[in-house]
Amino acid sequence: MASEKESNGRKESVKIRQRKLSDGTTSLYLDIMHNGKRTREFLKLYLNEEKSRADKEYNRQIMAQAEMIRSQRQIEVQSKQYEV
């Protein structure tokens, strides 16, 4: 996961968050702060319990997808295109 602060010292307004589900998987969602309002965007991406190398590789790929989505939303928020 990316660090809490950007290189210019401001806090990020879009963060990847995780929520543990009852079946043992972990759901990923974005926590978006825009104009003082917090919204959540659930990504429908899930991490598996890391029991094998294949699970670890799968989770790395899913986190990479989530990071790509996060950076796209960050750009949208910064350019004020994101509607809450």
Please report, for each region that a protein language model flagged, where it lies by residue.
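Basic/aromatic DNA-contact patch characteristic of tyrosine site-specific recombinases
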Residues: 1-84
